[in-house]
Amino acid sequence: MTRLTFRTTAAAVTATLAVTMLAACSSGGGGGAAHLTWYINPDNGAQATLAKECSAASNGQYNISTNVLPSDASQQRQQLVTRLAAKDDSIDLMSLDPVFVAEFAEAGFLAPIPDSDAAAFTKDIVAPAVQASTWKGKLVTAPFWANTQLLWYRKSVAQQAGLDMTKPVTWAQIIGAAQTAHKTVGVQAKLYEGYTVWINALVEGAGGQIVDNPGAVAKNLKLGLDSAAGTDAAQVIRSVVHDGVGGPSLSSNDEAGSLTLFEKQDTSAFLVNWPYVWAAMGPGGDKVSFRDSDVGFTTYPQTVAGQPSKPPFGGIEIGIGRYGKNKAAAIEATKCITSAEHQKEYMVSSGNPAANDTVYTDPAVEKAFPNGLAAVILQSLRQAAPRPQSQYYGDLSTALQEKFSPPGSVGSGSPAKAQKFILEVLKGDRLL
């Protein structure tokens, strides 16, 4: 994630309100159909396909066109914030990264979801996706697709180490196995959002949380980093570094870099990464020769032995723009887009996991995510933990990354230093 300051939405866009707004997408449909514009994150065209299918199924009620946002999540946010702060009525629907939901809701950029429609958006949805779509007790976005990280491993290395991968394993166990085998554990520790993802999962997995009172204003915000859970998280990071299993590029590794490391058969052992890994290594991807014979997958490692892990949670939620002129049609379109059938279709065509847990036993999904992978993804989603929900998330995440970087500097005092720094930044006493 680009290092931006997100202290308040108003502050982030003050300098941009004078910029001339881009022209709205051209209307596509007639006959009285409401024209809806859906701002989507880049994919392989699967969201655009859903837009066409739902338009056709609406019987002339609405017609959806799509506008593709930048590939970088922070740039997606910036474009949407700039437009919404200017009360752009061309934004009817938007694909939102879960970490921005609180900020958009707090700023009043999201149209309320009527209580009478909330059940349609939450039925059969995994709990973390509902949590990520909720702000101050109200559903403010509709869960669309959900993501989670798995533990990928070399079967031969795990077997040699005597690890039973049908049971939960700990970070300490996989670090020890990799160290003994002189191989690596792939993580994301670059100074970017992926590092926050790792830190948060470690803290949550130790029974803690980074933000203790979501929704609080900056002066009243309470953090849980300076805690036993924070210390446990720091110890895992320290072990990856000082036990020599992080690899030479640890402090610059993102998802792609850590996957590249894992694909080196002679040096790799374990990797935490998203489900796209399986397809990326297979036909049409990197065509890793040992994928089918020696790559296994299971749920995220435990931070503390015996305490269930809290895998990272990601995905996309659908927000309805406050200033759009066709909110009733937007609600109906969102119901169509996020239906179980369309979530299944999207999961198969894009490779992005569904938020609806009923689709995971569908034959088409099991074919696309074979050998029990679909079931492991669902299990991981059910126990996943979203990143901290806060209207100040951007500043919080950037400050956290700074105080935990480089990974080699992390020690028992890092959580307390990070907590102090984050609070100072949010209260305006320090600058990023």
Language-model regions, residue ranges each:
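Conserved N-terminal structural module of periplasmic/extracytoplasmic solute-binding proteins
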Residues: 2-102, 119, 286, 304, ...
